Amino acid sequence: MQTLQFLAAPAEAPGISGGQIFGAVTASGAALVAGTGLIIGLKGSDWGPLVINNKRRAAWWGIVTGTIWVAAGGTWAEIANGVGSVPPSLFAGGDFGNPGQGAIALFLTCCAFGPKWGSKTAPPAVIGLAAAVVYGTAGGVWGILVNVVRMLIGIVTGQR
């Protein structure tokens, strides 16, 4: 008597067809890569994506890195929230009144992109990190920016 054997199709291998364009990358992995890229870029790099040679690139790197850190959670979020808690605490309970998170977000954006920082790229990057945290709590157009970055991270990590 002969028996019929069914062979199952192999499981789909991770990769582009599996939705993870860089292989297995988690939110914590994305946070590690973003933080490393920010530090290397600020120290000086000649590789295109990591070249941070002006305030605009430094601020954007800070904003995106801070958003990724918050999305990753854990220690990454604690670092970002620590940096991001400084600007709101300067205005809390003082003689300045309560400007609101939206105004603080606008203030940080002006501070990161407005002044002539010269060759200094660290200040706008740190302000960008703080702004990312405030953007997440401010809502409005600031929340849209944060959600776009988080959606892109979800696509890269395969966690849609």
Which stretches of residues belong to each language-model region?
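Short, strongly hydrophobic alpha-helical membrane anchors
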Residues: 1-20, 157-160
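Interfacial loop-to-helix junctions that mark the boundaries of transmembrane helices
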Residues: 14-26, 52-53, 88-98
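N-terminal signal-anchor/start-transfer transmembrane helix
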Residues: 23-49
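Alpha-helical transmembrane segments and their helix-start/interface "positive-inside/aromatic belt" motifs
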Residues: 45-62, 117-127
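A generic, lipid-embedded transmembrane alpha helix
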Residues: 58-79
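Aromatic-anchored segments of alpha-helical transmembrane domains
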Residues: 68-71, 130-140
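Alpha-helical transmembrane-segment detector that highlights a single hydrophobic TM helix
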Residues: 80-108
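Juxtamembrane boundary at the C-terminal end of a transmembrane helix
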Residues: 139-160
